[in-house]
Amino acid sequence: MIIVADSGSTKTSWALLREAQEPLLFNTEGYNPYYVDAAYIQKSIIANFSHKIESDSVKHIYFYGAGCAGGKDQIVKDALMNVFPNASIVIESDLLAAAKSLLGDAEGFISILGTGTNTGIYEDGKIINQVNSLGFWLGDEGSGAYLGKKILAQFARRAMPIELMDAFEAEYGLTPSTVVPAFYDAELQNRYSAKFTVFLHHHIEHIFIRNLVKKAFIDFFENLVCLYPNYRSYSLNSIGSIGIIFAEQLKEVALTYGMRVGKINKSPIEGLITYHQQGF
């Protein structure tokens, strides 16, 4: 059996590939090693896999994950090794998963717009150039967590139109005085922030919200797209829920920067299944 996984900070999509059978697909929480440790990942995987398969039957695991760089990949690998002792394990970045899924063997610009953000240039099966997204605290412009921080700040400062202030308070039970403590008390603040994109989606027709979302994508372009030489020669290809939910605003901003829009998909898992089924 082969396991293929694509993990963001909020959700991991799993595919169990068995010869002559349909893939078994399911989701768990995300496992970004910048925010959770090996023990946390191991416990969660055991809880989610215990009734699905025999762990000893897994021979190969291909895990593509957010945060799996700079030595952090070993955290995920240690967790997987403890659960699946007979498996050979390959850990790659979520950006490479997006590239394989959307571009196949073609070269191009690839991005992730989910809870976090990532960008790169893909060529010959590898990411050959990558601007550091800097993560939740310092960067991740355009991501769900980034958008969430922006709307939380506007609410806390009472800088939103009164009708949006009232709607936000009614939906979440927060006030400008309680929203900041709630944010800092959250166990995983990137996930906590990202959940407020639902409010943005529900109110996207309001000019204040539309401008907030577009400004976040302008920040994305200025910090994570325009730093690539000749970026206008590529099309914008993106994986992630934020690119899907706010596709109209993303396309508007891309056009102002002279960049064509290519493929925008929610998840790379289907493309990864096709890629790795070649091993059967």
Feature locations, PLM:
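Phosphate-binding/catalytic loop of phosphoryl-transfer enzymes
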Residues: A69-E163
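Polybasic, low-complexity association/targeting segments
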Residues: Y62-A69
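Cofactor-binding loop segments of dinucleotide-utilizing enzymes, especially the Rossmann-like FAD-
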Residues: A66, D94, S241
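ATP-binding/phosphotransfer module of carbohydrate and carboxylate kinases, centering on a glycine-rich
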Residues: M1-I61, A79, L102-F109, K150-F280
